[in-house]
């Protein structure tokens, strides 16, 4: 399955909502930016709030009990958003956000160091995006990231193609080797088991149970209610 970042991304949002509810906080600030992250082909990732998918996969293959681990699903999101009225706010969408300008500011003010790629501050995500996605799924997420910079006029198409054609997704071969060893060790795999995983056929998230099954079933009804009665549950 392509989106092995789901458990981490889901947990971040779930516990943001839990703490917001506990302390009666009505707004959660999110660092998402439409101008740099607004485009993502559907086959590059999977629905992040797919609680049913996570639970089904864990029930089949999980070896560590989830215990009190909370997972955010579609219904949970609606409850937090509509009933508790806890809103996600995206401050960067209210600004003339220019990625290179923002990087220059945090370098100067906070001595920030460029990690060499989007989300590459995380070893797991760096290895996932820089190695697993290109080698197992033939997906280069830089295409999506660079496309948004082109759309927001922060980068030319020619410059983007130059990056894609001449720069490796990994900052260096040495770092790639270190991250690979780290990942294999943390996952409790042998190198042979890892290579077998990379070479095995990709399986869709939809092979397992999914919240999207409910969407598929209810979407015709929702479109009718929205058109005839102007009922907007998801807006």
Regions found by a protein language model. Name each.
Residues 1-235:
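Nucleotide-activated chemistry modules centered on ATP-dependent adenylation/adenylyltransferase
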